Design a protein with these regions (language model features):
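C-terminal catalytic lobe of FAD-dependent flavoproteins
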Residues: 5, 99, 108, 122, ...
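General beta-strand structural signal in soluble alpha/beta enzymes
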Residues: 17-19, 50, 113, 162-164, ...
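A short alpha-helix-loop-beta-strand transition element characteristic
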Residues: 66-69, 96, 217-222, 282-283
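Short, glycine-/Ser/Thr-/acidic-enriched flexible segments
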Residues: 41, 54, 84, 109, ...
């Protein structure tokens, strides 16, 4: 497997790999080095990396950190052989259907079909069984009935074959759908590479960028979009779970520029927020803060998001012109504020 190949190359480079060795605690010392405590003894190291998948917050708790990562149950099944595939003489194309929320690819002489159902479930929010290793969740095909109808309509051959096996397991989500790769906020010599939905496919590139940050202090590219420090203290467990559900439900939907989805809004407001709302303000969100973008000309003013300029462009332009030529007041709640005292 890929994991074994990576471990083999790591050993050749001098790494030590410990299997079946549960970590029980992490201790950071005054010189910022770490001791990893395991059931088989302690390991002293300079740097600790949290790359623990769905156990991210168990390890985070050992550092005193709560990461904005939640797990969702995700199901797919593999069919028995399909005659049309056996006789085709070529591989079937990968299919992703944003209307019915499923994806499909050939698996031997059958099909593997995965689903992003609206009736989705978080996983492990109340703790994870310590013995849940190389394990799966119970099947729950009733939850994906509505999605199955779309798949059957698109591929009638599915109704003529049986299901060979069903897989239901946890995958991780962050608040904005992007992973957390880089230094852990508030900790020294501590990094993470977590919140990846497809570690097998994403691990190589993200691991390369993380290695550069650890060795050189920064990566060769701007990595702010995956930096763990991009989230503030408002990203609690409840908000993380709600945003994970929203992201799962919108897996195959475009996220347009300037689109801010409704879940988890009003996490941070000021006394001016309801006053501006009463004046017809349209709000965006910046690090949890509700920030006014423009004043709607009418109560029924509605913007349809896309990749071009929308109706809000002229509204913002008018506000900019007014500020340039007149005196204006603006609420800047999303900016940093520093209190400096002393001589």
């Amino acid at each position: 497997s890929l994991c074994q190949a990576l471990a083999r190359r790591a050993r050749k480079a001098g790494a030590e790999v410990y299997r079946n060795t549960p970590v029980t605690a992490l201790t950071q010392h005054k010189d910022d080095t770490w001791t990893v405590h395991t059931e088989k003894g302690d390991i002293d190291c300079e740097v600790v990396i949290n790359a623990c998948g769905y156990r991210v917050n168990e390890v985070g708790a050992m550092m005193g950190v709560q990461h904005p990562v939640a797990s969702m149950e995700h199901q797919y099944f593999v069919t028995e052989d399909i005659k049309g595939i056996v006789d085709a003489g070529h591989r079937m194309p990968l299919l992703r259907c944003p209307i019915s929320d499923y994806y499909c690819r050939q698996e031997k002489n059958g099909l593997l079909i995965g689903f992003y159902e609206q009736d989705c479930k978080t996983w492990g929010m109340d703790g994870i069984d310590p013995h849940f290793t190389n394990a799966l969740c119970p099947d729950d095909l009733d939850r994906i009935t509505d999605v199955l109808e779309g798949a059957f309509a698109r591929m009638p051959a599915l109704q003529e074959v049986g299901i060979k096996n069903v897989v239901n397991g946890p995958i991780t989500y962050t608040i904005d759908g992007a992973p957390l790769v880089g230094p852990i906020p508030g900790k020294r010599n501590a990094f993470c590479i977590i919140g990846l939905r497809a570690g097998l496919g994403e691990g190589g590139g993200h691991g390369w960028l993380l290695a550069q940050q650890i060795v050189h202090g920064e990566a060769c590219y701007d990595t702010w979009c995956i930096d763990p420090r991009r989230f503030g203290s408002h990203t609690n467990v409840e908000l993380t779970a709600l945003k994970a559900i929203e992201d799962y439900q919108n897996e195959f939907r475009f996220h347009f520029p300037n689109e801010h989805r409704p879940v988890g809004r009003n996490a941070k407001t000021t006394p001016l927020t309801p006053i501006l709302a009463a004046e017809g303000a349209h709000f965006t969100v910046v690090n949890g803060w509700e920030r006014m973008e423009y004043i709607k000309p009418t109560a029924d003013f509605h913007v349809i998001h896309g990749f071009g300029f929308d109706k809000s462009f002229n509204r913002v332009a008018a506000d900019v012109a007014a500020v340039q030529t007149n005196v204006a007041l603006a609420e800047v709640n999303g900016f940093n504020r520093f209190e400096i005292t002393g001589a």
